[in-house]
Amino acid sequence: MKKNRCQRKEKEYLTHSERETFLLAKKLAKDFKGQEVVLLIGELGAGKTIFAKGIAAGLGMKNVHQVCSPSYTLINIYQAKYPIFHVDLYRLRKNSEILDLGWEDYLGQGIIIVEWAEKIKFNLDAIHVTLQMGERDHRKITVCL
């Protein structure tokens, strides 16, 4: 029997376009209190950055086109209802590298969105979002709250 890694409330969604994925994230973010950590898990092209843009929109960010994957800068910071710390772990190889970024300084200071979260082990309370690609722009999105 396969053990479910989500020990809390888990919901599954199907989206059929980037817009639907964006709107799902936007709706989810409207209930945020300002200290959430969102771990985005999925392969290249799965929609992690689109989901991050939706979260930013849900938090009232005016120009979500600014939101881009921080693959080279590793962390982008955006202003919205709460500060948004957008982290990309694609290039990191081990847990200690995230500590070198000053990761812990951001905890509790705003919303933290982590792309490629599967690359590092996290021992903290977080919202896990797994994005799986289907045909065309279809996505299966599992959210563990």
Model segments located where?
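P-loop (Walker A) phosphate-binding loop of NTP-binding proteins
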Residues: 41-43
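Short beta-strand-centered segment that lines the nucleotide-binding/catalytic pocket of NTP-utilizing
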Residues: 62-77
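N-terminal pre-Walker A segment at the start of P-loop NTPase domains
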Residues: 5-27
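Phosphate-binding P-loop
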Residues: 29-35
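Short hydrophobic/aromatic beta-strand immediately N-terminal to the Walker A/P-loop
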Residues: 37-39
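Conserved lysine of the Walker
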Residues: 48
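Short phosphate-coordinating micro-motif centered on Lys-Gly-acidic
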Residues: 2-3, 11, 94-99, 104-145
